[in-house]
């Protein structure tokens, strides 16, 4: 009996060893940004690895104004690409490889100002859905905001603005989406830029969550998109407007940012979210930082 047990024991372990899911490969693009990319990139990397789902590589571009011809990340090696990049244009073959990767089913995550990059690259604007600044106006597409439903407003005007940094409540608009499923209907985020007046093609776009932008400073007085998804070909895109960091990393220490970023990255990579909502996720009355 004992000898038979020894023979069967390795077979009993097979489901654990042979069929354990391989980690998802994630790539963070960075190296140029109008925010502190040397501070934010490790925070994004930690958020991904803390899930236990991802291994992470980082592709750092040449500095602004330098020769970009050798910047050619191997997008197709990864389940998801995270952009923490706002800077010089990529080489033509890198742009083509990125579009092909996304169209064929690659996952893409847009963090904060990454959606403001490449205003003259139509495919990138379509992939992000919305963007701002860099000369964007009604030619790039409508403003998108929430007024009991998604509003696509073609009125003329600049794309992209924000009031001074402040804390705000985020309202879930699509509670049945895998990213937002089981989240509180409203939750408090740390001091951050609340982007407003974003515009773009807004095709195949779903707004998952919004925040009311109080009409002070450059505030719009409207409910602005905060978390959104875009379908581009077979690719899944998660776009978070959160994550303003210039010296003070509070916005990326917010559990509201961390958990939605983690869930969005998993969804972009796989189409599913297996992570439970963390026990320290905030409601609308209590801020949570890590």
Language-model-detected regions and their locations in the chain:
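Bacterial N-terminal signal peptides
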Residues: 8-17
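Extracellular ligand-binding/catalytic regions of CAZymes and related secreted enzymes
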Residues: 21-24, 39, 50, 73, ...
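Catalytic beta-strand/loop cores that center a nucleophilic Ser/Cys/Thr
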Residues: 49, 55-57, 77, 146-236
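Bacterial N-terminal signal peptides that target proteins for export
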Residues: 1-9
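Short, solvent-exposed loop/turn segments at secondary-structure junctions
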Residues: 33-34, 88, 115-117, 185, ...
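Helical hinge/lid and interdomain linker segments adjacent to catalytic or ligand-binding clefts
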Residues: 21, 25-32, 36-118
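A glycine-rich, often tryptophan-bearing local segment used as a flexible ligand/cofactor-contacting loop or short
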Residues: 29, 88-178
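Structural detector of well-ordered beta-strand residues that form the stable sheet scaffold
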Residues: 105-109, 208, 238
């Amino acid at each position: 009996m004992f000898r038979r047990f020894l023979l069967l024991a390795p077979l009993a372990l097979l489901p654990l060893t042979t069929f354990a899911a391989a980690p998802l490969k994630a790539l963070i693009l960075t190296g140029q940004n109008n925010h502190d990319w040397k501070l934010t990139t490790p925070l994004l990397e930690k958020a991904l690895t803390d899930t236990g789902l991802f291994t992470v590589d980082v592709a750092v571009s040449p500095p602004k104004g330098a020769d970009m011809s050798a910047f050619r990340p191997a997008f197709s090696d990864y389940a998801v690409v995270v952009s923490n990049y706002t800077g010089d244009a990529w080489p033509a073959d890198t742009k083509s490889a990125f579009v092909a990767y996304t169209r064929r089913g690659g996952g893409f995550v847009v963090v904060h100002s990454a959606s403001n990059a490449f205003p003259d690259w139509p495919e990138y604007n379509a992939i992000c859905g919305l963007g701002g600044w860099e000369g964007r106006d009604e030619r790039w597409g409508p403003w998108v905001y929430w007024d009991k439903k998604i509003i696509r407003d073609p009125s003329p005007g600049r794309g992209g603005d924000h009031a001074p940094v402040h804390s705000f409540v985020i309202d879930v608009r699509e509670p049945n989406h895998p990213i937002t499923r089981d989240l509180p209907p409203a939750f408090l985020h740390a001091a951050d830029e609340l982007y407003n007046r974003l515009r773009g093609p807004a095709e195949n776009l779903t707004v998952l969550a919004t925040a009311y932008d109080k009409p002070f400073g450059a505030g719009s007085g409207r409910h602005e998109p905060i978390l959104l998804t875009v379908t581009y070909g077979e690719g899944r895109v998660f776009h978070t407007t959160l994550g303003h960091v210039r010296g003070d990393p509070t916005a990326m220490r917010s559990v509201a940012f961390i958990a939605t970023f983690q869930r969005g990255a998993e969804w972009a990579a796989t189409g599913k979210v297996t992570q439970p909502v963390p026990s320290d996720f905030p409601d609308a009355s209590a801020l949570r930082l890590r």
